[in-house]
A protein has these predicted regions:
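A short, N-terminal "cap"/entry segment at the start of jelly-roll beta-barrel domains
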Residues: 1-65, 140-143
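A short hydrophobic beta-strand segment most commonly corresponding to one strand
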Residues: 1, 56-58, 109, 122-139
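Short beta-strand His + acidic residue motifs that chelate non-heme Fe in jelly-roll/DSBH
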Residues: 72, 91-93, 110, 115-122
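A short beta-loop-beta micro-motif enriched in histidine and acidic residues
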Residues: 36, 49-54, 65-82, 123
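Short acidic-glycine-tyrosine-enriched beta hairpin
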Residues: 96-114
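Short, conserved beta-strand element in jelly-roll/cupin
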Residues: 58-62, 75-92, 130-133
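Short coil/turn motifs at secondary-structure junctions
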Residues: 64, 117, 134-135
Length: 143
């Protein structure tokens, strides 16, 4: 009888070294080039600094809210997503949670692939969103 072979150690993916990212508020950094046409995004430099591990941006939703445009059920194929309300309020629907009014200071996580939508928001709403990984797919669903 031979001695059983040792279990192989899991291969750990080596990521490039992360760097420091500093982002100061500048109005000109808000761009209408993101996922939603009714939003402006301020990239905080996290995706580049983390080599795609994570993404963080400030989202400014453009008012007034048009529910016909924004209330589209969808999900994101992500590993992690969290949102923090910096200013104003946003009313959301999340599968398994229902409708929730998030006000300044509110924070929430959305599990991977959870179906959700925005129902309404204040004209001054700003959100901080952190997502892993930085590149991900969004899937629009039939209502």
């Amino acid at each position: 009888r031979g001695v059983p072979a040792p279990k192989p150690k899991p291969v750990r993916k080596v990521r490039p070294k992360q760097r420091i990212a500093i982002s100061h508020h500048r109005e000109e950094d808000f761009k209408a080039d993101g996922l939603r046409a009714y939003a402006q995004y301020r990239d905080l430099g996290i995706a580049e600094a983390s080599h795609g591990l994570a993404q963080a941006h400030v989202i400014r939703l453009i008012g007034p809210c048009n529910p016909a445009e924004v209330s589209k059920l969808h999900f994101h194929d992500v590993e992690f997503q969290m949102v923090y309300v910096l200013k104003g309020w946003v009313k959301t629907y999340m599968e398994g949670q229902g409708e929730t009014l998030m006000k300044e200071g509110s924070a929430w996580t959305q599990p991977p692939r959870i179906k959700h939508l925005i129902m309404d928001y204040s004209d001054d709403v700003e959100l901080l969103e952190v997502i892993l990984p930085a590149e991900f797919k969004t899937v629009e669903l039939a209502s």
